[in-house]
UniProtKB/Swiss-Prot annotation:
Cell compartment(s), UniProt: Periplasm
Name of the protein in its database record: ABC transporter periplasmic-binding protein YphF
Lineage top rank: taxon: Bacteria
Cysteine disulfide partners in this protein: none
Lineage, top ranks: Bacteria, Pseudomonadati, Pseudomonadota, Gammaproteobacteria, Enterobacterales
Keywords carried by this UniProt record: Periplasm, Signal, Transport
Example GO molecular function: carbohydrate binding
Major location category of this protein: periplasm
Purpose: Probably part of the binding-protein-dependent transport system YphDEF.
InterPro entries: Bact_Solute-Bind_Prot2, Peripla_BP_I, SBP_2_dom
Length: 327
């Protein structure tokens, strides 16, 4: 073989080997992902565990930088600024406020950092412009499942004009949609149903206080709908505190150990609709890797499974399969 051809072949071989080595090194490069959890309720503990488990089981090296915003928009903003300064590969978050979090998400996006929302996000215009993906259980369908369960209960108990109070989390559009779905199905099946009150009570202590006031101020109240986990457990405790167990039913959202125990008891809590925090965490991490690697398909809003629990056995089984207490 002529010397020139041999030299050319060797150079090509060296280039190939060098390219392979660089590719392997790039593949081994550690990714850094920021993760922000909205508050300290059990659902977000489940999401955190799901994200951590998925990161641990992933074939890529991932460093997670995590915090809990505790429902505080300024904490959320400050942490996102820290993540932007660190030049992380992506940010996972459940937005504190649809409108209030928009500037924060915009800053990250304009810095070239993809933002992946889960459960709650910024307004639709902001999602379209600044968010790479938004994972959520269809809130309208969520509410419809709960409305069907409530209708089953009222029909079975021959209550044709039930009075229902709502303890809400309607600072978030997902909660508004949950209620709309609930009302739509309930009123189609039980036309005499009335929503007689709708008050905010996302945090447990406030939900208990609101629930008790609603019970005292609303004669012949038949049921309370809780739009979130805190609202649900608060409603149950309010019913018990006012000695209305067996008289006022609760239809709720978001499973936790205490909520599962109440469903197993089935005296007050009659149905719960839930999106598993762990499953959400797994799904949002998987989608984040797709976004980072530019492998995401065209769908920006991604639906996750919604579960309905209505029986004593459902509560018992949930407790048996969630011994760590994380939803």
């Amino acid at each position: 073989m002529p010397t020139k051809m041999r030299t050319t072949r060797n150079l090509l071989l060296m280039a190939t080997l060098l390219g392979s080595a660089l590719f392997a090194r790039a593949a081994e490069k550690e990714m850094t992902i920021g993760a922000i959890y909205l508050d300290t309720q059990g659902y977000y503990a489940g999401v955190r565990q799901g994200v951590q488990d998925a990161a641990k089981d992933s074939s890529v090296q991932v460093q997670l930088i995590e915090t809990n915003a505790q429902g505080d928009i300024s904490k959320e903003s400050t942490f996102v600024d820290t993540l932007v300064a660190r030049n992380v590969d992506a940010i996972i978050l459940s937005a504190v406020s649809e409108n209030g979090s928009s500037r924060t998400v915009r800053r990250a996006s304009e810095a070239g950092i993809p933002v992946i929302c889960y459960n709650t996000c910024i307004n639709q215009k902001g999602v379209d412009k600044y968010v790479s993906a938004y994972l959520v259980g269809d809130p309208l369908e969520f509410g419809k499942k709960l409305g069907n369960a409530a209708a089953d209960y009222f029909i079975a108990n021959k209550i044709d004009q039930p009075k229902i109070a709502v303890i809400n989390c309607e600072a978030f559009e997902v909660c508004v949609q949950r209620r709309k779905g609930f009302e739509e199905v309930l009123k189609s099946r039980v036309p005499g149903a009335q929503i007689v009150a709708n008050q905010e009570g996302t945090v447990l202590d406030k939900a208990i206080s609101v629930g008790e006031k609603l019970i005292i101020s609303t004669p012949d109240l038949n049921a309370i709908m809780g739009e979130s986990g805190g609202a649900t457990l608060g409603a149950v405790k309010a019913v018990r505190n006012q000695n209305q167990a067996g008289k006022i039913a609760v239809f709720g959202s978001d499973m936790t150990t205490e909520i599962a125990q109440e469903l197993e008891n089935n005296q007050v809590l009659k149905a719960v609709v839930d999106i598993s925090g762990k499953k959400m965490g797994n799904a949002v991490f998987a989608q984040t890797l797709k976004v980072i690697n530019k492998q995401a398909d065209g769908e920006k809003v991604i639906q996750v499974p919604i579960d309905l629990y209505t029986k004593t056995e459902d509560g018992k089984q949930w407790l048996a399969t969630h011994v760590d207490g994380l939803p």
